[in-house]
Amino acid sequence: MKISDACNHKKSLSFEIFPPKKDSELINIDATLDVLCELQPDFISVTFGAGGSLNCNRTIELAKKIKQNYHVEPVVHLTCLHYNRAEIDEFARILTAEGIQNVLALRGDRNPDLTEKDDFKHASDLISYLKPKGDFCFLGACYPECHPESANKIEEIRHLKEKVNAGAEVLLSQLFFDNTQFYRFVEDCRIADINVPIVPGIMPVINAAQIKRMITMCGASFPERFQKIIHKFEDNKAALFDAGMSYALSQIIDLLANDTDGIHLYTMNNPVVARRICEGIQHII
C-alpha cells in the first residue's frame, strides 16, 4: 500500500524507529515492534543509519520484518549524498523485490568519514532519478524552522517545492517544540502551492542530552515553556520523562485540534513512549 493513499484520506499515525547496531539488540527491537504494531500505526519508518552509514542491510531487514511479520506498511529512509547511481539502482531493485513501495527520500547528513558522490546533491535529485524506475511512493522531509543549511525560509520553501515537484507525495516534518512555528510553516507552504499532506513530527523529551543534540541537528528552537521543563527536571530522569511526555501530548492534542494531517512520532525505539502517547489520544485521532 502506498502511504499517500492513507495520508490523503485520514489523519495518519506513524512511528519512526532505527535499526539496531548490534546483533545483541535484535531481541529488543522485536519486543519494540510487538508493542508498536499492536498500536496499529498507518506506517513505520525505518532510518538508514546515523551519519549516512553505508551499512543499510539492517534497514532493509527491519522493513521486511515489519511488512511480512506484522503486516504494517514500512517506509524506508534512503539517503543519497554518499551513493552513486549504480548503488541507488541496486537498493531500488532490492526494495522492489521485497514489495516495499514507500521511500523517504533524503539527502543525508554530511559525514567527514564518508566520500560525497557527485550523482545526487539533493533529495529532489534522488526522487527524480528513481521515479521512473519503480512503483514507489516518495515521502520527503521538511523543516518547520528551516534546515540548518538553508539561508532563509524563502530558500527553504523553494527547495521543498522542488522536492514536491519531483514527486514527493507526503512530507514528514522534523521535530519541533513550538506549534506556532509549524502552523506558520504550513501556511507558507500552501501559499507556495505545496498542497501535499504535511505530517508534523513530534519527539517527546525524555533525555536532556539527546534532545539538545537533536535540536542542534534539526534547527528547532526552545520555547520558554519548554526551556523551563528542561531546566527544572534535567537532573531527575523520572520527572523529566513524565514532564516531557506531558509536553509532547499537549503538543499533539493541539495539532490534532487544528486539523493537521496526522502525527509522526519519533519513538527513539522506546515502546513506552509510543504506548503512552497513543493512550492519550486514542479517542482523538
Question: Residues of each region from the PLM?
Answer:
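N-terminal amphipathic alpha-helix/helix-capping segment at the start of soluble metabolic enzymes
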Residues: 1-15, 22, 282-285
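Active-site mouth loops of central-metabolism enzymes
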Residues: 12-28, 74-86, 139-155, 232-246
